Amino acid sequence: MKLTTKKQLMARYTILFAIISLIVFYLFYKNGVTFIWGAKGQDGLSQHINALMYWGEYIRNFFFNIIHGHFRFPMWDMSIGFGADILGTLNYYAIGDPLNLIYVFSNKSNIELLYNFMLVFRLYLAGVAFIAFGHYLKKDGNGILAGSIVYIFSGTFFSFAIRHPFFLNPMIYLPLLLMGVEKIYRKEKPYLFILMVTVAAISNFYFFYMLTVAAVVYALIRFPEYKEAGFFRTLGRFSGWYPVSYTHLRAHETEADL
């Protein structure tokens, strides 16, 4: 089995991604169609765009207040429905996703461009995460490359993620979360596992639940490979790092409330 370096894989993947993206998305460009799903008032236009623009303004106001000596972190907004918790409401729209910080630069004139760019960029990152996982497992380079393309240009993307861009987030997180599982099995540092659990939890609670189930199933499938390495000690590690991530999240929520 011939192993390919990360740089070679990334270069080949980037070129292949660009070619396939041009083929897949050309009709959108040719017909002047945006990725925003909203011709008949669907979620893209009625919810996602509004949530992202709100988030961008929220971040700008937060830094504006800090610059002017007022440390304010609003947690409630009466303009959301009949009044709602800001972070709790926006969590559904993956506002906790670090990539959404780019919307601090959003306004009415560039929001469509940012929205379209971030959808394609997330798709690209999902393939990068798949490649990182495959390379970590020392799989064949051609197999990794083929798998990454099949993974991202799948039915999930064309049926759901192209309408709801944050559906791409679990496609980015899953390979990295599974890599974290492998690292714990191999008695390596658990930092990647903790990081991915934390990011998944703050991004979207629905997908966090699904990713947790996937990680457990994967850990059980991989168990025969590592059963001689002390199963109960390894199980204890998995059980321990999830609460660590949760405690970290709760600490930040408490600070925000104060």
Language-model segments: residues:
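Membrane-interface transmembrane helices that cradle and orient dolichyl/undecaprenyl
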Residues: L177-L192
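Perimembrane helix-loop-helix junctions
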Residues: L211-P243
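Membrane-interface coil-to-helix junctions
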Residues: L22-G127, I149, F153-M171
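Conserved small/polar residues in nucleotide/adenosyl-binding loops
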Residues: T247-T254
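Start-transfer (signal-anchor) and selected internal transmembrane alpha helices
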Residues: M1-N31, R237-Y242
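Transmembrane-helix signature of polytopic, membrane-embedded enzymes
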Residues: F130-F153
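Membrane-interface alpha helices of multi-pass inner-membrane proteins
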Residues: Y191-F205
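Hydrophobic core segments of transmembrane alpha-helices in multi-pass, intramembrane catalytic enzymes
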Residues: L123, F166-L178, M210-Y218
